[in-house]
Regions:
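Non-catalytic regulatory/interaction regions at protein termini and inter-domain linkers
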Residues: 170, 189, 203, 218, ...
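Juxtadomain coupling helices with adjacent low-complexity linkers
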Residues: 111-155
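Regulatory input/activation interfaces that engage signals or partners
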Residues: 2-109, 122, 128, 132-138
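Residue cluster at the C-terminal edge of the helix-turn-helix DNA-binding motif
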Residues: 210-215, 223, 227-231
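Recognition helix of helix-turn-helix DNA-binding domains
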Residues: 184-219
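Regulatory hinge/linker segments at domain boundaries
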Residues: 143-173, 233-236, 241
Length: 247
């Protein structure tokens, strides 16, 4: 299957992702990987959230696992607009209790194309072989990751940082709603994740925006992104994620 770029990442629990391989045939779409994605933006990534939910292995288009309003989210506009990836197909293989191996193939501005249904079908023909190879590679111990206990959740970290950095006291629900908004969930989707009504979600969002003196998702993103970067830099075992039940 022709692609413009490819990256292999392993996620383990809520530890920082480990990048094993990257290659871009055209523009360097990975130029912001260390400075942006790995310093906190990954927390909002659909593939990372899919990993945390421990859902089935398979081959997925990005929007197959993304929230319902992902392409309208400020994260999508900010990060995907920044790197220039226009389409993505990921091979996702779960191994063990908390580890996910991913290989993501992308299209970017160099080809100005999207993956066709025929591209996807050809890749799926080899799905069983690809998954077997990924599991065998992991079992061989080629890319071991340290296993450490999990501690503070991303939600708790957001609450604590808002208090310490901005003297703002968020309830757990307000913090959960904030994170889900940033991931690209609609009010209906947030309600399904938190088992509350869309109307209640709107109440929490209104409270959140009022408390933080915000008027847009872009302002919420600007306020919370430095905090997510701070949380992501905590030693492993000091942070783990929550709000990860549905896509």
């Amino acid at each position: 299957m022709p692609y413009d770029n490819v990256i292999a990442i392993t996620y383990q629990g809520s530890s920082l992702p480990v990048v094993h391989h990257r290659c871009a045939r055209g523009p360097n779409v990975f130029r912001h990987l260390e400075t942006t994605y790995l310093t906190g933006a990954y927390v909002l990534d659909p593939i990372y959230q899919y990993h945390l939910r421990r859902e089935r292995s398979g081959i997925f288009r990005l929007l197959d696992v993304a929230p319902d309003q992902f392409k309208r989210s400020h994260y999508y506009e900010w990060y995907y607009g920044l790197i220039g990836i226009t389409d993505e197909i990921s091979v996702v293989q779960t191994v063990g209790d908390d580890t996910t191996i991913t290989v993501s193939m992308g299209k970017d501005r160099s080809s100005a194309q999207m993956f066709s249904w025929l591209d996807e079908r050809r890749l799926r023909r080899h799905e069983a072989v690809i998954m077997t190879l990924l599991k065998a590679h992991w079992a061989s111990g080629a890319d071991p990751l340290s296993r450490q206990p999990r501690g503070l959740t991303i939600t708790d970290g957001l609450i604590a940082a808002m208090r310490d950095r901005h003297s703002l006291t968020l309830s757990r629900r307000q913090a959960e709603v904030a994170l889900l908004i940033l991931q690209g969930h609609s009010s209906v989707s947030i309600g399904l994740n938190l088992s509350i009504s869309p109307q209640t979600v709107k109440v929490y969002r209104k409270q959140l925006y009022h408390k933080c003196n915000l008027s847009s998702q872009a302002e919420l993103f600007a306020l919370t992104m430095p905090i997510l970067q701070q949380i992501s830099m905590l030693p492993t075992g000091k942070q783990r994620s929550s709000v990860t039940r549905a896509g």
